[in-house]
Amino acid sequence: MATAEPAQVGLVIVTHGGCGECLLAAAADIIGPVASSTAVSVVPSEAFDDIVRRVGSACDQVDSGVGILILADVHGSSPFRACLAMVDGTRPVEIVAGVNLPMLIKLATCDRSGLRPAEVAERVKEVGKRSIRLGSELTGKFAIPREDHH
């Protein structure tokens, strides 16, 4: 008899255009599917209330009862503000703005069972921050300014 998977924090990615779906697909190509996850794509012509409803439906889809982590693309944007509407006291929710591929790879490879959304969010936020690097920091080489640029 197979044992049931332990409940874990659900993941919703809310982005402009199809960015969220592309990030999930890229993570799956690299490391395998990100469990208990879905994406919501927001288009410019969409009414804000419709975005909020779709984000809520996505949260319902991945909620196993332990809470939701929502990753948005841009702080302060319509997708991000729609995510804020999910913080309504009905279930544990945390939101992180600035989603990137290293965050999703971390989520695909870490065990989210037994953790609260805020704990998962802190881990993912740190991975996202550490993944942003300048090439010159890594190589010690800097671009040479060209004289013809004004």
Where are these regions (language model features)?
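N-terminal loops that bind phosphate or other acidic moieties
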Residues: 1-150
